[in-house]
A protein has these predicted regions:
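A recurrent domain-boundary module in secreted/ectodomain proteins
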Residues: 308, 313-365, 428-436
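Tryptophan-rich substrate-binding surfaces of secreted polymer-degrading and adhesive proteins
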Residues: 360-436
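Short, low-complexity, polybasic intrinsically disordered segments
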Residues: 282-299
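Chitinase-like catalytic core of GlcNAc-active glycosidases
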Residues: 34-226, 230-254, 260-266, 272-284, ...
């Protein structure tokens, strides 16, 4: 059942002229939801909204989300983006061109996701287009526009993606943060994330101003997330350094301990080649995931499911694409890390003695060969039980559940999908079958 709109937000809806498009006011000041093409459902546990990767439902060759769910085990997607109309006005649209009030495409997609056992969060803002916070005159009017989206789709989660040029406009930021606070108050249980650009020092001056606005308003979302890409980053180590710096910024802004700050901090990465030519591989996602789990990070997501496919050619001629990653991968490799963050196990493929396919070698910068020496904990000599016949483990190869490799003189079997997780390592994804 849809959330009912409170009198406070209803008044703003009336003022904004939104009632006729999705709500029918009743005499006592409440509102009734009308049929919209997206069936409401019970909320998922918050870990799925925290792990939901971004997906553009109308652009960049959107994949079938239910097929991605079946292949990976992912249960939630972050649908992007809600913007102001390109023609002007304070009403919500998809990508500035498709009014939410007359949507016939995204609603059925959401219903299909829910029918498959999943759900969505909707992201507002992004890098391109005019944001509602820029054109709606007040936080209440901005909230009213977003409330239409929440009511139309029966949402349990929403993301505020505050980027350039909007977050350079103090009034627009005040409208967005104020709107987020209103929605949080008027829609009990609504999961709210705030996402902003990351820098090698955490976030920039405008990001810190946004945090100051939230502190002034007394607003605390489920998390503040940074995007550590397109800013001179070089792999996972630089991203982790940025997250540690952002943790310090959150501590200093809100007076939190480091643990409290991490519990309100998130990361939104970009898989493959970024807009500025940085490269992020599966091994980088695994390393950041390990860090996120070790410190209790509140959110782990990425841009985007549309891009979680191999290009042809694999490197896409050193170009960034909205519909493939420009690095060697199998379909949905990066989405599976979100599944792991949510605490689930990706689906296991039928057992096989060797990987079902050998990915094309990754571009320079990603591990491409097995270690040159065995771990110190492994045997120092070849066991007498015979020579290993299974293929040697390689950090560059993606293995499915049941795959068998040799490493350190032992035979190992993968428990589930894995890449760059050393047999016997802390990830625990390999079963030691003994000497080979």
């Amino acid at each position: 059942v849809f959330r009912f709109t409170s009198p406070r937000v209803l008044a703003a809806l009336v003022a904004a002229g939104l009632v006729a498009t999705g709500l029918a006011a009743v005499a006592d000041g409440s509102a009734q939801a009308v049929t919209t093409g997206a069936t409401a459902t019970t909320a998922l546990s918050s870990n799925w909204y925290a792990a939901a990767p971004y997906l553009m439902p109308l652009q960049n060759d959107p994949p079938d989300p239910t097929a991605v769910m079946a292949a990976t085990g992912i249960k939630a997607f972050q649908l992007a983006f809600i913007l102001a109309p390109n023609s002007g006005g304070c009403t919500p649209t998809w990508d500035g061109t498709n009014p939410v009030s007359s949507d016939t495409t995204v609603g059925p997609m959401i219903s299909a996701i829910r029918a498959a056992g999943g759900d969505v969060s909707v992201s507002i803002g992004g890098y391109n287009g005019t944001k509602l916070g820029q054109v709606c005159g007040t936080p209440a009017a901005t909230a009213a526009a977003y409330q239409q989206v929440i009511t139309t789709y029966g949402l349990h989660a929403i993301d505020f993606d505050l980027e350039e040029p909007e977050y350079e406009n103090a009034t627009a930021v005040a409208n967005e943060i104020g709107a987020a606070q209103i929605l949080q108050q008027e829609d009990p249980g609504l999961y709210v994330s705030v996402t902003t650009p990351g820098t090698t020092s955490g976030t920039g001056w405008f990001g810190e101003q946004m945090l100051d606005q939230a502190k002034t308003d007394g607003f605390t979302p489920n998390n503040f997330s940074i995007m550590p890409f397109d800013g001179g980053f070089n792999g996972a180590a630089s991203q982790i350094s940025a997250l540690e710096a952002f943790n310090t910024i959150l501590m200093n802004t809100f007076g939190w301990t480091s643990a409290q700050a991490y519990a309100h901090e998130g990361v939104s990465m970009m898989n493959g080649r970024s807009d500025s030519g940085e490269y992020f591989y599966q091994s980088d996602f695994q390393t950041v995931l390990n860090f996120a789990e070790s410190v209790g990070l509140a959110r782990y997501t990425n841009w985007s499911v549309n891009r979680d496919l191999p290009c042809t050619p694999v490197d896409n001629n050193d170009q960034t694409s909205g519909s493939c990653s420009s690095v060697a991968q199998q379909p949905w490799d990066f989405t599976k890390y979100s599944v792991l963050f949510a605490g689930a196990t990706p689906p296991v493929s039928p057992p096989t003695s060797t990987p079902t396919s050998t990915p094309t070698p990754t571009p320079t910068g990603s591990p491409t060969s097995s270690p040159t020496s065995s771990p110190t904990s492994g045997p120092t000599s070849t066991p007498t039980g015979g020579s290993c016949t299974a293929a040697a483990w390689s950090s560059a190869t993606a293995y499915t559940g049941g795959a068998v490799v040799s490493y350190g003189g032992d035979r190992w079997t993968a428990k589930w999908w894995t890449q760059n997780d050393t047999p016997g390592g802390p990830a625990g994804v390999w079963t030691n079958d003994g000497p080979c």
